């Protein structure tokens, strides 16, 4: 089975919000609600991974610039 392409963070968040809205209505049949919940869990994991990678990038950038001299811009 082909793996679904990874969504960008904003798209992931939007899709999660849409799933939550559908689940909150309480109108979904049980099996469909479970499928939506399963999809939401996967999206949360993707979002967390993206946030962790972003945090790592920020830490690397901060470490690189930790000893840089500050200069005034004209």
Curated annotation (Swiss-Prot):
<dbReference type="GO" id="GO:0009318">
    <property type="term" value="C:exodeoxyribonuclease VII complex"/>
</dbReference>
<dbReference type="InterPro" id="IPR037004">
    <property type="entry name" value="Exonuc_VII_ssu_sf"/>
</dbReference>
<keyword id="KW-0378">Hydrolase</keyword>
<keyword id="KW-0269">Exonuclease</keyword>
<comment type="similarity">
    <text>Belongs to the XseB family.</text>
</comment>
<dbReference type="Pfam" id="PF02609">
    <property type="entry name" value="Exonuc_VII_S"/>
</dbReference>
<comment type="function">
    <text>Bidirectionally degrades single-stranded DNA into large acid-insoluble oligonucleotides, which are then degraded further into small acid-soluble oligonucleotides.</text>
</comment>
<keyword id="KW-0540">Nuclease</keyword>
<comment type="subunit">
    <text>Heterooligomer composed of large and small subunits.</text>
</comment>
<dbReference type="GO" id="GO:0005829">
    <property type="term" value="C:cytosol"/>
</dbReference>
<keyword id="KW-0963">Cytoplasm</keyword>
<dbReference type="GO" id="GO:0006308">
    <property type="term" value="P:DNA catabolic process"/>
</dbReference>
<protein>
    <recommendedName>
        <fullName>Exodeoxyribonuclease 7 small subunit</fullName>
        <ecNumber>3.1.11.6</ecNumber>
    </recommendedName>
</protein>
<dbReference type="InterPro" id="IPR003761">
    <property type="entry name" value="Exonuc_VII_S"/>
</dbReference>
<dbReference type="GO" id="GO:0008855">
    <property type="term" value="F:exodeoxyribonuclease VII activity"/>
</dbReference>
């Amino acid at each position: 089975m082909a793996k679904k392409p990874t969504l960008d963070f904003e798209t992931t968040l939007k899709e999660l919000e849409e799933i939550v809205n559908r689940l909150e209505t309480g109108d979904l049949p049980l099996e469909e609600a479970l499928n939506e919940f399963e999809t939401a869990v996967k999206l949360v994991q993707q979002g967390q991974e993206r946030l962790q990678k972003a945090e790592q990038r920020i830490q690397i950038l901060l470490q690189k610039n930790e000893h840089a001299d500050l200069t005034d811009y004209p």
